[in-house]
Amino acid sequence: MQPKYDYDAIIIGSGPGGEGAAMGLTKRGARVAIIERYDNVGGGCTHWGTIPSKALRQAVSRIIEINQSPLHGNTRLPHTGFSDILCHADQVINQQTHMRQGFYERNHCQIFTGEASFVDEHQVQIHYGDNTTETLSAENIVIACGSRPYQPQDVDFDHPRIYDSDSILDLKHDPHHVIIYGAGVIGCEYASIFRGMNVKVDLINTRDRLLAFLDQEMSDALSYHFWENGVVIRHNEEYEEIKGLDDGVEVRFRSGKRMKADCLLYANGRTGNTDTLKLDKVELEADSRGLIKVNSMYQTAARHIYAVGDVIGYPSLASAAYDQGRIAAQVIIKGQANVQLIENIPTGIYTIPEISSVGKTEQELTAMKVPYEVGRAQFKHLARAQIVGMNVGSLKLLFHRETKQILGIHCFGERAAEIIHIGQAIMEQKGEGNTIEYFVNTTFNYPTMAEAYRVAALNGLNRLF
């Protein structure tokens, strides 16, 4: 009997969300087509977001480490330009693309390279680069088309000195001074990268403190570290006009201030890539930022059409997007999912040094009137940190005074995003498995950064009476 549809599922986008859905479906025998608008798979995560920015950060971090190491005396590395370290990022991108292409090929996912748009509830049209089209049909459709940097209409992003977080990866000159408008995660990460290359950085924050969703101590630590390293932060500022010049960019603010720099990176928000999908054909609509509303099983208002990843908004993390795609695949196959996204998703912010956290902040616990206590460990007191010259950083554990249950973990310092997982694993244990006493009663390798958990746990338990 001829199948009713060409495929069991069409997935629009090949980033982490699309990949998670595709692997979850093909492993269960489903026929899957993937429509990717760009020539290579991987989505924004691989080509413009997570992978290249973290590769840049790694290169800059190593340059800083070598230049500051006492082992090298007064020897410093020769000046390395932005375009030079981009070569390292390109190598990583190529490796990631090749690997992910292999995933799809081995699992018999058919990839179509073109722009997708809905024809009706079960049909999607592909617009190819040669102006031809093809229409595919499927019983289920997964929208995993990601997001792009938000571009306000009154800013000329065609000007060669005005960039967003995608186009900054094509920076051809070596700026001496950069203005970064937007002090969210992306803005702070690039502030670290540029300052690490001895570029003068003005970081414009439209709010009253950096990364307000973080525990305030972590936010304050980042602000202090930026200040100590020469990043100038301007809080509560909004632009009146951003004007491209022959040799740079001038910004006029509503407060009356004016600034000029070699270039400007606009990093103030993102918008979903839904404007070309023709969602009206399936009676769906996106909000003002291009985001699609879904239920707990990632179904849209049309129950056989799913959406995962950045296109549904929070938490907008590559790690979460992959799991969302995997959960959507389960729902498509079984009608329900036997797993769900964990409640406490760790955040990793790849500034120099890193910040990572999972669970509640002190401010949240205080507002909830939870009787908690705090345990702290300073990296500079740990043997491993002293060996590698890691003088900056701390680990902070929040736990219930009576049950000893871990409620939140916050880390500031090199490799924070790796260190956080030790605590996360214990925090996710059920019942009595989640206890701060685990870190006191367990033997870790020594000397390692895991020692921070023992020190912080003892520090916190010693506060109890």
Curated annotation (Swiss-Prot):
GO terms for biological process: 2-oxoglutarate metabolic process; NADP metabolic process. It comes from the Bacteria. Its EC number is 1.6.1.1. This is Soluble pyridine nucleotide transhydrogenase. Keywords: Cytoplasm, FAD, Flavoprotein, NAD, NADP, Oxidoreductase. It is an enzyme of class 1 (oxidoreductase). It comes from Sodalis glossinidius (strain morsitans). It is found in: Cytoplasm. Binds 1 FAD per subunit. The lineage of its organism: Bacteria, Pseudomonadati, Pseudomonadota, Gammaproteobacteria, Enterobacterales. It catalyses: NAD(+) + NADPH = NADH + NADP(+). GO terms for molecular function: dihydrolipoyl dehydrogenase (NADH) activity; flavin adenine dinucleotide binding; NAD(P)+ transhydrogenase (Si-specific) activity. Its cofactor is FAD. GO terms for cellular component: cytosol. FAD binds at residues 36-45. The gene is sthA. Pfam families: Pyr_redox_2, Pyr_redox_dim. Belongs to the class-I pyridine nucleotide-disulfide oxidoreductase family. Conversion of NADPH, generated by peripheral catabolic pathways, to NADH, which can enter the respiratory chain for energy generation.
